[in-house]
Amino acid sequence: MKIILWLCVFGLFLATLFPISWQMPVESGLSSEDSASSESFASKIKRHGEGTFTSDLSKQMEEEAVRLFIEWLKNGGPSSGAPPPSG
């Protein structure tokens, strides 16, 4: 039992000698990863916003093309001689 106690005391002694010097490079590495992560996050938000705008615009253009096509069909469609709307 005394051996376990002495090993614990020795381990605590060693832990007081080396903790800060071994942890410093890890923290500096994390801070650079955090900044890269935040830049990546910002670019993803921007891309998502642009993609949402493009998606909404594409949806509106498709709806307009469908509306024009239905009007063309109502006005006689292929038998009217007018070309179908391009969209």
Swiss-Prot record:
- The entry's keywords: Amidation, Cleavage on pair of basic residues, G-protein coupled receptor impairing toxin, Hypotensive agent, Pharmaceutical, Secreted, Signal, Toxin
The organism of origin for this protein? Heloderma suspectum (Gila monster)
Q: Which residues form the propeptide?
A: 24-45
Q: State the family it belongs to.
A: Belongs to the glucagon family.
The role this protein plays is:
Venom protein that mimics the incretin hormone glucagon-like peptide 1 (GLP-1). It stimulates insulin synthesis and secretion, protects against beta-cell apoptosis in response to different insults, and promotes beta-cell proliferation. It also promotes satiety, reduces food intake, reduces fat deposition, reduces body weight and inhibits gastric emptying. Interacts with GLP-1 receptor (GLP1R). Induces hypotension that is mediated by relaxation of cardiac smooth muscle.
Any coiled-coil ranges, and where? none
CC terms in the record's Gene Ontology section: extracellular region
Expression sites by tissue: Expressed by the venom gland.
Classification via Pfam families: Hormone_2
PTM Serine amide: list the residues.
Answer: S86
According to UniProt, the name of this protein is Exendin-4
Q: Which GO terms describe its biological process?
A: regulation of blood pressure
Q: Does the keyword Disulfide bond apply?
A: no
What InterPro entries is this protein classified in? Glucagon_GIP_secretin_VIP (IPR000532)
